[in-house]
A protein has these predicted regions:
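Structural signature of WD-repeat beta-propeller blades
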Residues: 4, 12, 45, 56, ...
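Surface loop/turn motifs at the tips and blade-to-blade linkers of beta-strand repeat domains
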Residues: 6, 48-50, 102-105, 146-150, ...
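Conserved core positions of repeat-based scaffolds
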Residues: 12-15, 24, 64-67, 76, ...
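Loop/turn position at the start of each blade in beta-propeller repeats
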Residues: 9, 42, 53, 60-61, ...
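Loop/turn-rich, solvent-exposed surfaces of beta-rich toroidal or solenoidal domains
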Residues: 217-249
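Short glycine/serine- and acidic-residue-enriched loop/turn motifs that recur at repeat junctions
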Residues: 1-2, 23, 27-42, 75-96, ...
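WD40 beta-propeller repeat fold
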Residues: 1-42, 47-49, 57-59, 67, ...
Length: 292
């Protein structure tokens, strides 16, 4: 059996095989392993709920898991305290140890699932973004997927503990923020407010979410984005930029200072292999890879 995809959080891991089988291990206090119990496992165990299904993608948050199966069905399991597994408003629950279908995507084809902290997101083939879970910047929680109403055609999404970053046509936009100001501050402007609207009836005006453009990259085209718990990384065609919390050295700047706007990271011989680089973030670290 060949494992094609893994998704790791601090205390639990998931593995998806080439045959669409899902295996999980680690902490299961909130049912985030989807095994129907709350027992933790120190070896991978198959999630039997999906035994007759084909799992295509997985995403792990702090205490919850999302799974996309063939047929464009999205499942959530684990902690539901902030709505991160898409539980119905009429059926509040603190956790769920068996996968449940998340409603609210209509006939959209889902091509990407994302999770971090208590946040969840799904990207459609048309570049539309749905978000749910803990509200950003003090907004109320979303207990069901909410469509981000925007003219942007989003191609990449990454989530932090308190912020989200999206990439559209080489430009970066931010949702939310936190005390270290991941990609915000005086260098962020919002010439167009891209609002989110609920995918199920909702009348609360205060629930409007907005994307803000990150405009401090001197016109450079961004090709990849990544987010850790409280920091972010942007890979342009010529440079790597990091910003946010720096207490563990995760910004790669030779210090542990926090940064409120993107800083260029010095990578030796950058220009000789810039087109083959990839960038990824863990909770408190950043990795730059070079492909063959």
């Amino acid at each position: 059996m060949l494992f094609l995809m893994t998704n790791v959080f601090d205390v639990f891991n998931s593995f998806c095989s080439d045959e669409g089988h899902l295996f999980m291990c680690g902490d299961n206090s909130f049912g985030q392993l989807g095994t129907g119990d709350n027992q933790s496992y120190n070896l991978p165990v198959e999630v039997l709920f999906f035994a007759s299904k084909h799992v295509e993608q997985i995403a792990c948050g702090m205490r919850h898991t999302l799974a996309l199966v063939t047929g464009d069905l999205v499942y959530g399991f684990g902690s539901a305290r902030h709505g991160q597994i898409g539980n119905s408003v009429s059926k509040p629950q603190k956790s769920c140890n068996l996968p449940e279908v998340i409603q609210g995507f209509g006939s959209c084809k889902i091509v990407g699932l994302f999770a971090n902290g208590d946040h969840s997101a799904a990207l459609t083939a048309n570049g539309e973004l749905y978000i749910w879970g803990r509200g950003f910047s003090g907004a109320s929680n979303d207990l069901h997927p909410r469509l981000l109403h925007s003219s942007l055609r989003i191609s990449q999404v990454t989530l932090g503990w308190h912020h989200a970053i999206v990439l559209a046509d080489g430009e970066v936009y931010m949702l939310g923020g936190y005390r270290h100001r991941a990609v915000s501050g005086s260098h962020v402007v919002s010439p167009v407010r891209h609002q989110s609207v609920p995918s199920a009836p909702c009348t609360a005006v205060s629930d409007v979410r907005t994307l803000e453009k990150v405009s401090c990259l001197d016109g450079e085209r961004v090709v990849q984005i990544a987010a850790g718990a409280e920091h972010s990384a942007l890979l342009t065609e010529r440079k790597d930029h990091d910003m946010g919390l720096g207490e563990h050295g995760q910004l790669g700047l030779g210090n542990t200072d926090d940064q409120t706007f993107p800083q260029i990271v010095n990578i030796p011989n950058w220009r000789s292999f810039a087109s083959t680089l990839g960038i990824y973030c863990g909770s408190g670290f950043t990795v730059v890879t070079k492909s063959a």
